Amino acid sequence: MAREDSVRCLRCLLYALNLLFWLMSISVLGVSAWIRDYLNNVLTLTAETRVEEAVILTYFPVVHPVMIAVCCFLILVGMLGYCGTVKRNLLLLVWYFGSLLVIFCVELACGVWTYEQEITVPVQWSDMITLKARMTNYGLPRYQWLTHAWNFFQREFKCCGVVYFTDWLEMTEMDWPPDSCCVREFPGCSKQAHHEDLSDLYQEGCGKKMYTFLRGTKQLQVLRFLGISIGVTQILAMILTITLLWALYYDRRDPGADQIMSLKNDTSQQLSCHSVELLKPSLTGIFEHTSMANSFNTHFEMEEL
């Protein structure tokens, strides 16, 4: 009975952990898509520079192929574990444990690679010149992708130009920076800020922001947190799976152990009840003999009187 309760508890815990696997995997896929949007815009602006090379070396080998593949595989493994837990199938649970172990090793290797990989990209003036040279194509109909990338980066990272917002005036024929440089953006805000109050424009350039992007972003922090959480959950799931396998294996190897213990308890209770039943007649007889003796003595005393 105790073993059956333990198995039931282990199964409930594995159900909960598999649900966590699905939720975390979906979250990691969403964060990876979130990072991809940032990476596409950064790569558009930093093409043919050292920054582009650093971005590719830092993010793409781990963030996209490995993490996406691991999360998709983990969703399938969660289904495998769920089926094995429901059916109490030892083979499915063994496959589930082995798959979790392989995924954990891959995640551990990726985590070590990410933290050990230190890309040092010194700021070079040639990179700044390359970034400035692309500013001349801003707003042109055939360079809408570049216009979108500049606007996205300036809004998200709260910067303007490459070194300073005056880069837009130097490198283009514009009389004022784009509206995406405004602290409070609205149509015509940059023109108003240029003529009235320059503090309404972002004062920091986007060049250094791109290098800061390589040092770690909030998206990458969230991704690392989710990766660590998935790893801890996998360790717990593997421990519970081993325990459940042990319980199910010995339950099948000695299926009557609990039944024998239960039978012993029932037999003991029945013997106790039977002993009480056997004692009842003897106690009744003793009581009757005692009563008869007392009545006889009383009758004898009355005759003597």
From Swiss-Prot:
Its main location: membrane. The chain crosses the membrane at residues 13-33, 60-80, 90-110, 225-245. CDD domains: TM4SF12_like_LEL. It comes from the Eukaryota. Residues 1-12, 81-89, 246-305 are cytoplasmic. It is a multi-pass membrane protein. Belongs to the tetraspanin (TM4SF) family. This is Tetraspanin-12. The lineage of its organism: Eukaryota, Metazoa, Chordata, Craniata, Vertebrata.
